[in-house]
């Protein structure tokens, strides 16, 4: 369990040291907001970042090349269980003629950022056009000059299909650099049949059920502390968009207790999906 404790400690320190205020971290778009950001190949901009980012060393070929390289999380696109095809993505390719390289290579925000950070800071290409990041990480990229402004004049759906409360967010006023994708919620996931066989119901409705002793060692929580801590604070009756340090530490103590007693099997990024598929984990 020490590995899980260490991960929680690292993520918590990163959370508390974030340049964003607590209110901005968990506001408006919801606990689990995720934004699709147009990667700018490290191009610097007037973003107020502490260190100026070198100018991009790669050429924008979007006018001449009908290709799109997209990095995202596992499970963020509708997929045919039998064939592995992605109907929505296939329809987009057919309609536009754009060749899409769709890569599920984001398991954790910090992990992915560490992989491409040096290239971004040096103004080099990361070989992606579109990256799906949680709101707080999208904010860091935008503020650091790593994102490219969107041309809304050729994106009518950017306004037509986005609800009003997500049209204008604190980290990206006017949505100049990002658009919401799978945004505005933090959820539980579980294996219905296995859950019912252990606790008598196939539905999870509260955190209390996750801590049922019959699920000991079969529960995973996300390494994305903004999701995990937000849900725990709400469970404890506190507002995850406006909380005190004492309330935050109360939630941390609850998490540590459940890790130390073995109730929580692991703290993971989106790699939890493999444990769900194998049956090692029943709920996340």
Which positions does each model-derived feature cover?
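A structural signal for short loop-to-beta-strand junctions that line the ligand-binding cleft
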Residues: 59, 124-133, 148-190, 218
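Early extracytoplasmic/lumenal segment of secretory-pathway proteins
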Residues: 55, 61-139, 274
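Ligand-binding pocket segment of bilobal, Venus flytrap-like solute-binding proteins
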Residues: 218-232, 236-284
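Hydrophobic/proline-rich hinge and linker segments of small-molecule sensing/allosteric domains
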Residues: 186-200
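Flexible hinge/capping segments at coil-to-helix
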Residues: 197-214
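N-terminal secretory signal peptides
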Residues: 1-20, 31-38
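Bacterial lipoprotein signal-peptidase II cleavage site
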Residues: 42-51
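Short helices/loops that flank or line small-molecule/ion binding pockets
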Residues: 113-127, 140-144, 209, 213, ...
């Amino acid at each position: 369990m020490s590995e899980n404790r260490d991960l929680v400690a690292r993520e918590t320190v990163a959370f508390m040291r974030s340049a964003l205020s607590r209110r901005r971290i968990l506001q408006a778009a919801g606990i689990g907001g995720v934004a699709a950001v147009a990667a700018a190949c490290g191009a610097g901009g007037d973003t107020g970042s502490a260190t100026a980012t070198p100018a991009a060393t790669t050429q924008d070929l979007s006018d001449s090349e009908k290709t799109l390289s997209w990095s995202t999380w596992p499970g963020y696109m509708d997929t045919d269980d039998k064939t592995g095809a992605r109907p929505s993505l296939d329809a987009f390719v057919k309609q536009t003629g754009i060749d899409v390289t769709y890569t599920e290579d984001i398991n954790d925000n910090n992990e992915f950022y560490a992989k491409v950070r040096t290239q971004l800071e040096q103004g080099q290409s990361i070989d992606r056009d579109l990256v799906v990041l949680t709101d707080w990480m999208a904010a860091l990229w935008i503020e650091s000059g790593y994102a490219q402004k969107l041309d809304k004049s050729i994106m009518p759906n950017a306004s037509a299909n986005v609800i009003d409360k997500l049209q204008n967010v604190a980290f990206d006023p006017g949505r100049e650099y990002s658009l919401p994708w799978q945004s505005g919620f933090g959820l539980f996931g579980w294996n219905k049949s296995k859950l019912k066989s252990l606790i008598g119901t196939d539905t999870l409705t509260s955190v209390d059920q996750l801590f049922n002793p019959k699920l000991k060692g079969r529960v995973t929580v996300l390494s994305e502390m903004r999701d995990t801590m937000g849900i725990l604070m709400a469970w404890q009756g506190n507002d995850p968009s406006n909380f005190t340090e004492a309330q935050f530490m109360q939630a941390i103590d609850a998490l540590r207790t459940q890790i130390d007693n073995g109730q929580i099997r692991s703290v993971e990024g989106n790699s939890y999906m493999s444990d769900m598929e194998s049956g090692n984990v029943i709920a996340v």
